[in-house]
Amino acid sequence: MMTDSTCRLFSIAQPSHRTCVHSITRDDLRSSFVTGGEAATTAVPKWAQKTVTLPPQKRGCHLITPLLLKDIEVDLGQFSCGLAHFFLQHTSASLTINENYDSDVLEDVETFLNGTVPEGRRAPWKHTLEGPDDMPAHIKSSMFGCSVSVPITDGQLNLGTWQGIWICEHRDHASARKVVVTMTGT
């Protein structure tokens, strides 16, 4: 049973004109509120999480939206409104959102990264245990990051018309990569 103080605390997240009319129990995943004399029901957010294993990619940037959707579409369809968070579990590749149509953009970004972060004999890096592409891969990964978040609307990722999720592979000889996808919403 929800106490008055718990009810007030829970109501903070709701518009101020709503008043709690009954409590949430463990078996009851909904809380009713009165709005102008009518009862409204607010759903408690759902959660889903899945690890997607991507096949090894050659060095460069690659559009992976279709690969991700193939593995998460059933879970994604359970949400009418929410957020999908994509987290790459690696330090020598990165995730970003960018152009999904013209492959020249993929190549141009790779060209920019290679011109910005030196490799080989001209590079000043100490961390070269796994080869000359090792430390540059870590730096490039830090530049873009290892995660992106995308709104979920009506069971679909709400990306812009020309947006797609990319993996940027910064190693010459990469292995499979794992992306943890966490979805929450109603």
Show where each model-derived region lies.
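Active-site histidine-anchored catalytic micro-motif
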Residues: 2-186
